[in-house]
């Protein structure tokens, strides 16, 4: 680990010199690339330097104990040694985590697809609750959201809604939301007070560049139609809505939120590109050992990941067995406690995996 950290620090120093060089700065694309590399390792290097400083201080204190010093000073030094020894261990643990392989998509924007599942109108209302929860979470993170397409019901639910979340590290946190979300509550239409169970599925897809996924124009069919609102009534007098069908895979994407057909086509192509990327990734990962399917953050949308129990005010994340009792705050976007727990669990799995590899 130390050799790798030394190499990273050396690389960081080289990059620091380069990004300060006027001749490099003249080439903006190259300079931005180097700045990105520099920022990616900066936190590791700063933490490594704190670790080295703690080790140096620890050695200095141990050296002091070897000399003849008075009892009071000796007691102070011994106490400081205990604190520094703990700091060194903590730094080593933090550095191990920081050196874990990163998901290449973590820094990307995301598309989030929410669909009402079993439960009819109640499931559609729950899908709307999840949409609000994620938009509130995005606000807390300083991210921006943009609706790509929505199929709204007459009473304010969503049969399906697709939206984009733009912001640094959006995928790194939102990816843990992929899966089936289950809700247990008494619907407003239920006169007997009986608890109903409904579900909604969430898929989180990283935004992909044109270079990541190439789409042959001959492989798509584009249909245009008039945008419709609640109950199917027409809300536009021009054919501005767009439906794109990818013929080889049968994937269909619709977008009607914009007034201009060209804008709807651009949005639909972005979503199609993300879905094709997800499909390619799923096929690529199909050969990976079965045990990896059970890991945290596998992103399997068929997996039941979380239950929202309204009568008890409870949220349970089944992947890590975490239960918290603050349903109202959670649905208002205060979801970091669960996401942080999922990140920690995934890091622990990666550490274990690396340990097994070494064996």
Curated annotation (Swiss-Prot):
Alphabetical keyword list: Cytoplasm, Methylation, Protein biosynthesis
GO CC terms in record: cytoplasm
Cellular compartments annotated: Cytoplasm
Gene3D superfamilies hit by this protein: 3.30.160.20, 3.30.70.1660, 6.10.140.1950
Post-translational modification summary for this protein: Methylated by PrmC. Methylation increases the termination efficiency of RF1.
GO MF annotation list: translation release factor activity, codon specific
Modified residues (N5-methylglutamine): 233
Domain of life: Bacteria
KW Cytoplasm (keyword) present: yes
Main location: cytoplasm
Biological function: Peptide chain release factor 1 directs the termination of translation in response to the peptide chain termination codons UAG and UAA.
NCBIfam families: prfA (TIGR00019), PRK00591.1 (NF001859)
Family: Belongs to the prokaryotic/mitochondrial release factor family.
Classification via PANTHER family: LD18447P (PTHR43804:SF7)
Protein name (Swiss-Prot/TrEMBL): Peptide chain release factor 1
């Amino acid at each position: 680990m130390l050799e790798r950290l030394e190499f990273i620090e050396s690389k960081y120093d080289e990059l620091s010199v380069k990004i300060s060089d006027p001749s490099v700065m003249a080439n903006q694309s190259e300079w931005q690339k180097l700045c990105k590399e520099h920022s990616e390792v900066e936190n590791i290097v700063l933490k490594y330097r704190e670790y080295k400083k703690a080790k140096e201080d620890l050695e200095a204190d141990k050296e002091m104990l070897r000399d003849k010093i008075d009892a009071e000073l000796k007691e102070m030094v011994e106490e400081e040694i205990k604190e520094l020894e703990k700091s060194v261990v903590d730094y080593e643990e933090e550095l191990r985590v920081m050196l874990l392989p990163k998901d290449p998509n973590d820094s990307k924007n995301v598309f989030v697809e929410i669909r009402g599942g079993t439960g009819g109108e109640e499931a559609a209302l729950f899908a709307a609750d999840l949409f609000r929860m994620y938009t509130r979470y995005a606000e807390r993170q300083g991210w921006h959201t943009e609706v790509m397409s929505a199929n709204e019901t007459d009473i304010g639910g969503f049969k399906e809604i697709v939206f984009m979340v733009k912001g640094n590290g959006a995928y790194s946190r939102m990816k843990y939301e992929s899966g089936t979300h289950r809700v247990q509550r008494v619907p407003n239409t239920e006169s007997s007070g009986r608890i109903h169970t409904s579900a909604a599925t969430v898929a989180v897809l990283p935004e992909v560049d044109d270079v990541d996924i190439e789409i042959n124009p001959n492989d798509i069919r584009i249909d245009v139609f008039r945008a419709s609102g609640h109950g199917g009534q027409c809300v536009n007098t021009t054919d501005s809505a767009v439906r794109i069908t990818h013929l080889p895979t049968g994937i269909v994407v619709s977008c009607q939120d914009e007034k201009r057909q060209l804008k709807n086509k651009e949005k639909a192509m972005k979503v199609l590109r993300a879905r094709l990327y997800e499909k390619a990734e799923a096929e690529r990962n199909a050969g990976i050992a079965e045990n990896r399917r059970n890991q945290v953050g596998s992103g399997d949308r068929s997996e039941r990941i979380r239950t929202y129990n309204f009568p008890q005010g409870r949220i349970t994340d089944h992947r890590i067995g975490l239960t918290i009792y603050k349903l109202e705050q959670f649905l208002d976007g205060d979801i970091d406690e669960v996401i942080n727990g999922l990140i920690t669990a995934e890091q622990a799995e990666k550490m274990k995996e690396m340990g097994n590899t070494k064996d």
